[in-house]
Design a protein with these regions (language model features):
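An acidic/histidine-cluster motif and surrounding catalytic segment
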Residues: 1-105, 115-144
Length: 144
């Protein structure tokens, strides 16, 4: 079981990859899951827009798309591919007054929370997602 990081025609490098993987393992455990094979693919805004159209039928930009490959039959191991648009993450960081790395960590944990079953489609579930992101970002600060 591993966390892997890839680039899809972009040059982003996530710092502290091992520490990030350990943090994500703790997040999954806190949510009642075990972290399995999870891949992060960093890509452009255009690439994620194309994927959003093709796979989800949405014609808009987004910062993250999570594909869940977890086997829910009797196991609590999560697995999946998490595609992150580094351009939109940087734009969002500026908009929200965060650093690019802080916003990237938020999006990274957001993907794992989706694998753990957290939805964000309604105002209520979106607020729950945001509270969990904040909680686990505090975990990160303790890891540093």
């Amino acid at each position: 079981m591993a966390v892997r990081y890839y680039n899809d025609n972009c040059k982003y490098r996530l710092p502290q990859k091992r520490l990030t993987a350990e943090w994500l393992r703790r997040v999954a455990e806190e949510e009642g899951y075990e972290l399995g094979d999870v891949s992060y693919i960093f890509c452009s805004a255009q690439r994620l827009l194309e994927m959003n159209r093709q796979y989800l039928g949405h014609d808009y930009f987004t910062d993250v798309i999570t594909f869940d490959y977890s086997d829910r039959n009797g196991t609590r191991i999560i697995a999946g591919d998490i595609f992150i648009d580094v351009e939109t993450v940087a734009d969002n960081a500026r908009q929200y007054g965060a650093t690019a790395l802080e916003e990237m960590r938020r999006v990274v944990v957001h993907g794992v929370l989706h694998l753990c079953g957290q939805d964000d489609k309604t105002p209520r579930t979106n607020a729950q997602m945001h509270r969990k992101e904040d909680k686990y970002l505090q975990f990160w600060k303790k890891e540093e």
